């Protein structure tokens, strides 16, 4: 009897999901992406060699693991083929092991132009998008005018649909943003050619997943971004355009929620955020700089410096509820080595000192003041530790306190970037 496991972020993304997916696929037959696009950046370090993936599931570096991109993912064919080429240059047989849903919405050049024009027009109120067309592509999907991967193989119909979509968006670019329109013929020719380049990988991903389930194979679902960036449950409007939560697994692949056996929530030992938006525990002092420098907190997709802050247990508790999380994986514990004192946010207050529940709209969240509980740090190194018994006593106490506050067990502890630098207390597939 196989097990079906979801791996997702519980914070604002960048929690270290890529490493954990790569690590746990030693017991998986399939890995599926279910939302997002090439705005995600998953960094893998194997035997000291770093690989950054944006679209292709992190299981691609495991031999004999089938990788799937589900219908919930918005697809830039150009970005996908660039990523495939980079992996093939390393000797990874991507085309044999990657399959794409024919229902994936396409990201077109006009979506990228719109995304960038909008961010420029917002001035100092930027949302902080990656400018890669993700949001506009999802908008077209919801507006029912979006083009999907399977459409590319019906040339005349595709050309007609593309013309309508581009007329609409080019009008907005010219008339509202005073920006250059995107060329229709070039977009058509390029997209048709790119579609042919991936044709052998296009399939019914939902059918593939259910076939594997019926055969009793282990399946992993890989989330992108994090719960606090969810379009419905995140710090709106400073969020992404998809459902990053466990519910997105079902809608983004066609794999029903009752088939899921375990949800693993990835959380850093502290908190980070890229781009704009509220961040109650953000640090602007030496501790913040220490976390940023020691944690190498720069985005793998954009290269932008990440904002750093103390661990937010209030936000994590909400993520646990939203995702029905079975167990936690705490990453980057080693980054806290050397701090004399470590804070955990255990509550929120308003300006008058009144206790608050989670405030998920950005305006309310901006007014939140964190309530901290302080714990002693540790001077010993946790880097590369592979047994919980070998952790410093204060590091163990920190982990136990997080478990007590959130009510969720920490099943996995990451103590370094390499896949072997990990403590597994309970394997999700066991």
Curated annotation (Swiss-Prot):
Pathway(s) where this gene product acts: Purine metabolism; AMP biosynthesis via de novo pathway; AMP from IMP: step 1/2
Annotated EC: 6.3.4.4
Gene: purA
Active site: 14, 42
Self-association state and partner proteins as the record states: Homodimer.
List of residues binding Mg(2+): 14, 41
Chain positions recorded as substrate binding sites: 300-306
Function, in words: Plays an important role in the de novo pathway of purine nucleotide biosynthesis. Catalyzes the first committed step in the biosynthesis of AMP from IMP.
GO (cellular component) term, any one: cytoplasm
Keyword terms of this UniProt record: Cytoplasm, GTP-binding, Ligase, Magnesium, Metal-binding, Nucleotide-binding, Purine biosynthesis
Name the UniProt record assigns to this protein: Adenylosuccinate synthetase
Subcellular localization(s) per the UniProt record: Cytoplasm
Highest rank taxon of the organism: Bacteria
Cofactor section: Mg(2+)
Source species: Alcanivorax borkumensis (strain ATCC 700651 / DSM 11573 / NCIMB 13689 / SK2)
Sites where the protein binds IMP: 14-17, 39-42, 130, 144, 225, 240, 304
Amino acids binding GTP: 13-19, 41-43, 306, 332-334, 414-416
Reaction(s) the record says it catalyses: IMP + L-aspartate + GTP = N(6)-(1,2-dicarboxyethyl)-AMP + GDP + phosphate + 2 H(+)
Molecular-function GO terms, alphabetical: adenylosuccinate synthase activity; GTP binding; magnesium ion binding
Membrane-spanning residues: none
Keyword Lyase listed: no
PROSITE patterns noted in UniProt: ADENYLOSUCCIN_SYN_1 (PS01266), ADENYLOSUCCIN_SYN_2 (PS00513)
């Amino acid at each position: 009897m196989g097990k079906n496991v979801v791996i997702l972020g519980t914070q604002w993304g960048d929690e270290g999901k890529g490493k954990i997916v790569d690590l746990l696929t030693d017991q998986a037959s399939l890995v599926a992406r279910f939302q997002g696009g090439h705005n995600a950046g998953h960094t893998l370090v194997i035997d000291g060699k770093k690989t950054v993936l944006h679209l292709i599931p992190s299981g691609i570096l495991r031999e004999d693991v089938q990788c799937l991109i589900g219908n919930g993912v918005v697809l830039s064919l150009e970005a996908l083929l660039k990523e495939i080429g980079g992996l093939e240059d390393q000797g990874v047989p991507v085309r044999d092991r990657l399959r794409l849903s024919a229902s994936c919405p396409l990201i077109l050049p006009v979506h990228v132009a719109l995304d960038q024009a909008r961010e420029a027009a917002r001035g100092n109120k930027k949302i902080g998008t990656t400018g890669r067309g993700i949001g506009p592509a999802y908008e077209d999907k919801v507006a029912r005018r979006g083009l999907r991967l399977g459409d590319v193989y019906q040339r005349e119909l595709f050309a007609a649909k593309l013309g309508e979509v581009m007329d609409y968006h080019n009008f907005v670019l010219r008339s509202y943003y005073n920006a250059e329109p995107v060329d229709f013929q070039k977009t058509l020719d390029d997209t048709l050619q790119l579609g042919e380049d991936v044709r052998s990988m296009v399939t019914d991903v939902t059918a593939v997943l259910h076939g594997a389930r019926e055969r009793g194979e282990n399946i992993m679902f890989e989330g992108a971004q994090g719960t606090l960036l969810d379009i419905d449950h995140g710090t709106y409007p400073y969020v992404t355009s998809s459902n990053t939560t466990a519910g997105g697994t079902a809608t983004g692949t066609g794999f029903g929620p009752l088939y899921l056996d375990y949800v693993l929530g990835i959380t850093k030992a502290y908190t980070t955020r890229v781009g704009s938006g509220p961040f109650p525990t953000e640090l602007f002092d030496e501790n913040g700089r220490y976390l940023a420098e020691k944690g190498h907190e720069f985005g793998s997709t954009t290269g932008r410096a990440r904002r750093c802050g103390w661990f937010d247990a209030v936000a994590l508790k909400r993520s646990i509820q939203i995702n029905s999380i079975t167990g936690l994986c705490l990453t980057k514990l080693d980054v806290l080595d050397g701090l004399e004192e470590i804070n955990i946010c255990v509550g929120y207050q308003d300006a008058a000192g009144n206790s608050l529940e989670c405030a998920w709209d950005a305006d309310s969240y901006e007014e939140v003041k964190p309530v901290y509980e302080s714990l002693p740090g540790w001077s010993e190194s946790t880097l590369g530790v592979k047994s919980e018994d070998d952790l410093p006593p204060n590091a163990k106490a920190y982990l136990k306190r997080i478990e007590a506050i959130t009510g969720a067990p920490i099943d996995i502890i990451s103590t370094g970037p390499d896949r072997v630098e990990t403590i597994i207390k309970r394997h999700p597939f066991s």
